[in-house]
Amino acid sequence: LSKAPVIYSHSSAKAIANHPRNVPDDVLKRIAVNRGVVMINFFSGFVVPESAEIMREMFHVRRGLMAKYPNSKKDVDREYKAWQLKNPFPAGEAKIIADHIDHVVKVAGIDCVGLGSDYDGITTIPKGMEDVSTYPLLTELMLQRGYSEEDIHKVLYKNVLRALKECERAAKKMSSQP
């Protein structure tokens, strides 16, 4: 087991959106013991339940196309793109991000959740969370759900900074051991 906090930098709660990249509750409980952080991703395919289902189907479609056209990436890409256009991800609403935060807090505690928006690598984002300028909406949603100012600061930055500092301490300790 890791002697340093584990950071899931771009994951969410699997109990809400069943995607393989998301973190199941049994692992969330271990994250709490490890003092790690699950940083909620904003990609609709990871956080919106219906979109996560489409993503799971999408993997199977892609594998099937690769078997159908083993020597033609062009054909795979063409049919895959057509399938994607017929099966768009529902974007969802900003509240789904707060739902994931709530779930991680419920299972692992307020010290184990952060934000891993992934704005530079995603295509579909819940409405209201289009870029970092929309964070005040998420802050407002958290206030409405009873989070304190300190809790919100933990989610926005304090938890991941704490975990990174603990990782640095663990690395120094391990590097000084024979």
Task: Tell what function each PLM region has.
Residues 40-45, 107-130:
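Short acidic/histidine-rich active-site segments
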Residues 130-178:
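Mid-to-C-terminal alpha-helical segments outside catalytic/metal-binding sites
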Residues 24-80:
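Aromatic-lined glycan-binding groove of carbohydrate-active enzymes
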